[in-house]
Amino acid sequence: MDSPWDELALAFSRTSMFPFFDIAHYLVSVMAVKRQPGAAALAWKNPISSWFTAMLHCFGGGILSCLLLAEPPLKFLANHTNILLASSIWYITFFCPHDLVSQGYSYLPVQLLASGMKEVTRTWKIVGGVTHANSYYKNGWIVMIAIGWARGAGGTIITNFERLVKGDWKPEGDEWLKMSYPAKVTLLGSVIFTFQHTQHLAISKHNLMFLYTIFIVATKITMMTTQTSTMTFAPFEDTLSWMLFGWQQPFSSCEKKSEAKSPSNGVGSLASKPVDVASDNVKKKHTKKNE
């Protein structure tokens, strides 16, 4: 007989994301679009462009994973129900009378609920990406990690293409160069679920899904309640960097010291030469006067 914990985790892993969790994901994604400078005015001026941007935020992970697996990038359009649902969320968010949706979303409990439900969908996307990649490349763990990462956090990456088309792209805002917290935590989850799928972790999938979801939901709520934009992995990253690349630091410090000493020696030798020349001239003048 299974324990209550296993029964709870198994029931949680069988929870359907449609429609409530998908609605929360679309709402948070569309609200992120609306909060961009000039997004509301663009929706009235060019609604097609605004709708396209919102769909990239909602389905960016699926689009990126399709591109990586050489599948049709417009495959997400085949799911008419989700497209209509996301489009409805976009419409009422931008064109609701008196901006009621944005006013309701401005309350912190509503934001906490929607953001927490969105993080639940992140777990399902990572697991779906890892499983889908395994159907193409059996136990190809690098591909599985990449597709799981793309499926879970591809929305923040694929939107760089949208900014490039609009002329708002900046190199310092590239997700590949400066990874955000969602991208890092999704990459961590993709690695963990890949190892579990390849049987390198002795834990069941439903238990891992439950534990990982609790972790990302708790950290997201903590970030929002404490009003911190990121929860850094800096201690772990610094430790890993020291373990892998720390041996290079002594050599680099020695090189810097040698470079610092060499200019000073050169300056001293150059400065001593005029003094020696001046002393020789004074001696010559003194001898001439004596003569």
From Swiss-Prot:
Oligomeric form and interacting partners: Homotrimer; conformation seems to be controled by binding to diacylglycerol (DAG).
Transmembrane segments: 20-33, 51-70, 83-99, 105-121, 140-156, 180-195, 208-227
GO CC terms, sorted: endoplasmic reticulum; nuclear membrane; nucleus; sarcoplasmic reticulum membrane
Reaction(s) catalysed (UniProt annotation): K(+)(in) = K(+)(out)
Compartment annotation: Endoplasmic reticulum membrane
Residues reported to bind a 1,2-diacyl-sn-glycero-3-phospho-(1D-myo-inositol-4,5-bisphosphate): K118, R122
Species for this entry: Homo sapiens
Organismal lineage: Eukaryota, Metazoa, Chordata, Craniata, Vertebrata
Ranges for region Disordered: 256-291
Cytoplasmic side of membrane: 34-50, 100-104, 157-179, 228-291
Protein's job: Intracellular monovalent cation channel required for maintenance of rapid intracellular calcium release. Acts as a potassium counter-ion channel that functions in synchronization with calcium release from intracellular stores. Activated by increased cytosolic Ca(2+) levels.
Its membrane topology: Multi-pass membrane protein
Disease involvement: Osteogenesis imperfecta 14: An autosomal recessive form of osteogenesis imperfecta, a disorder of bone formation characterized by low bone mass, bone fragility and susceptibility to fractures after minimal trauma. Disease severity ranges from very mild forms without fractures to intrauterine fractures and perinatal lethality. Extraskeletal manifestations, which affect a variable number of patients, are dentinogenesis imperfecta, hearing loss, and blue sclerae. OI14 is characterized by variable degrees of severity of multiple fractures and osteopenia, with normal teeth, sclerae, and hearing.
Record's protein name: Trimeric intracellular cation channel type B
Similarity field: Belongs to the TMEM38 family.
Keywords annotated in UniProt: Endoplasmic reticulum, Ion channel, Ion transport, Membrane, Osteogenesis imperfecta, Phosphoprotein, Potassium, Potassium channel, Potassium transport, Transmembrane, Transmembrane helix, Transport
Pfam families: TRIC
Phosphoserine carried by residues: S262
UniProt cross-references to InterPro entries, sorted A to Z: TRIC_channel
Chief location category: endoplasmic reticulum
